[in-house]
Amino acid sequence: MTSLAAGKPAPLGASYDGKGVNFALFSAHAERVELCVFDEQGNEQRVDLPARSGDIWHGWLDAAGPGLRYGYRVHGPWDPAQGHRFNPAKLLLDPCAYRVEGDLPDDERLHGGMWEPDHRDSAAIAPKSQVVDLHYDWRGDKPPRTPWGETVIYEAHVKGLTLLHPQLPEAIRGTYKALGHPVMIAYFKSLGISALELLPVAQFASEPRLQRMGLSNYWGYNPLAWFALDPRYASDPARALDEFRDAVKALHAAGIEVILDIVLNHSAEIDLEGPTVSLRGIDNRSYYWVREDGDYHNWTGCGNTLNLSHPGVVEWARQCLRFWVDECHVDGFRFDLASVMGRTPEFRQDAPLFEAIRRDSVLSQVKLIAEPWDIGPGGYQVANFPPLFAEWNDHFRDISRRFWLQQNVSLGDFAQRFAASSDLFARDGKRPSATVNLVTAHDGFTLRDCVCFNQKHNEANGEENRDGTNNNYSNNHGIEGLDANLAVIERRRASVHALLTTLLLAQGTPMLLAGDEQGHSQHGNNNAYCQDNALTWLDWRQANPGLTAFTAALIHLRRRIPALTRNRWWQEGDGNVRWLNRNAQPLTAGEWQLGAACMQIQLSDRWLLTLNATAEVVDMVLPEGEWRAVPPFAGEDNPVIMAVWHGPAHGVCVFQRS
């Protein structure tokens, strides 16, 4: 390998065309870029990328093909005070690598240096990029395109969801293959969910601190390679991409969408003491938000923050999202710490990346979900994202928990959240589906732990229980921990049913955490990001079948209520909703201000929810007509017909008018 042809500047990354490979790399401040190719024995050959178009360096290697192992060495100024940290002693991953060989070890040879360059060569231990043939037979695949108003999201971890499932073939448990297996698809269908939202599947790394403690990053929110499927979830690591695509195809055939959690906010290079393995060495000042003193703005809490207002970085991010849609047929994205995407550095609805997505004919048509905050100044941006985005709604989570578990919010506050938080989202042309309602998620207590623990128990994370939020709005019902007497167990069961009913029958887009429908507990750990063990893996043998059936019945009931599926804002007198007191009369101004007590919510005229958040039995007079309790609150063969509901403490019921 003596030289390269000029090649072309687009697309970014290593593109195989059947005859050779085109390499294209963005770096605005580089002075020279070397392509480094490795043989099976690890011997390295270097050659300069010969052409530069604007800020894209590129070249074409004849007769190269899939499996080629490569990296970059990028030359440029070493001027940390100005944000420049070029160090050609460090082998760098292609930011668009479709496959990565090797992990990210805790080894000082990967460090580029803080204020002086580290000249130790890192090639022997650095992860390598690999060329991939992206061809795949998508014939017959048809994205479900489920309307937002009919969407029910199920948030899950590839490994944690499937590793302990006894009916799956042992060889595929914990893998992408398991997601598309008939056993899992049958479960998803019986539960009634419409979309599977996966925690990050792009290749990630464990932080050095965790490695030193013998732990690992389990959730995956520490990205190393945004375009590469993580091989640890593949039964055959060399086929990770195709195994994932096989699963997507199978899920689509069953009418289930696939939404990916993607981390476009920071990288695994962490802070200045972290490794130089990709973006830092390619163009630190362009890829990251750099302070005037040369250090990073840490608006993510992870050591660095991607600068998604730089045109070159915006195009890289856009191509990343297009890869997942075009080549993997995913149906949407959940963006972690998504306020970073809108920073300029202040948050703007017309930030460059938002505009790039809006103008993209493909990305503008998929489901986009924001976690609408980061930890930087002005980072909390709930309901402020562009209209294309739905958003996680922490108001719904907190008010729902406080209503049922702490009884310290008003009926008015609860009703506002139940009605798709219209005070927040009913503007800018947004629909009720813009609020993604949740009572739990991967971070925080599981639903069972919400009713079993008043305090977090994160000692296993190695931070002396300092990590994780202290604002859990939970209630152990008198006994801390899973073990309890029958009276406490019954109160906990009622609270779980009430929270699930609120989640799945409120207006907006519901998101269910995998395992909540089974009674899964993390034993009070509300930040299990580093627990790749039985604490986080769903134990299917211990699942609560009654709770699973209850959850499935609620999801199927949701689809029968027009007020919840039409995706239109409720208006006074439109027949969608009536808010009633225990005597079936409209709530008065004074009653709206009452602390969490009891109320009735009549939906689409024919459906009635009765809610008793008190610790006492409350009799409620139902509205005029003949009402029967419906599953999961009564059996179809023996429906309960009544005019008065004897509401148990912490109780809820749903009726249909005959």
Swiss-Prot record:
Its Enzyme Commission number?
3.2.1.196
Q: Name one GO molecular function term.
A: glycogen debranching enzyme activity
Q: Which reaction does it catalyse?
A: Hydrolysis of (1->6)-alpha-D-glucosidic linkages to branches with degrees of polymerization of three or four glucose residues in limit dextrin
- S-S bonds: none
Cross-referenced InterPro entries: GlgX_C (IPR040784), GlgX_Isoamylase_N_E_set (IPR044505), Glyco_hydro_13_cat_dom (IPR006047), Glyco_hydro_13_N (IPR004193), Glyco_hydro_b (IPR013780), Glycogen_debranch_bac (IPR022844), Glycogen_debranch_GlgX (IPR011837), Glycoside_hydrolase_SF (IPR017853)
- Site description Transition state stabilizer, residues in chain: 443
UniProt xrefs under SMART domains: Aamy
Q: Which GO terms describe its biological process?
A: glycogen catabolic process
Entry annotation: catalytic residues: 336 (nucleophile), 371 (proton donor)
What SUPFAM superfamilies does the record tag this protein with? (Trans)glycosidases, E set domains
The Swiss-Prot or TrEMBL record describes its family as follows: Belongs to the glycosyl hydrolase 13 family.
Q: Which NCBIfam families match?
A: glgX_debranch, PRK03705.1
What this chain does, per the entry, is described as: Removes maltotriose and maltotetraose chains that are attached by 1,6-alpha-linkage to the limit dextrin main chain, generating a debranched limit dextrin.
| Entry protein name | Glycogen debranching enzyme
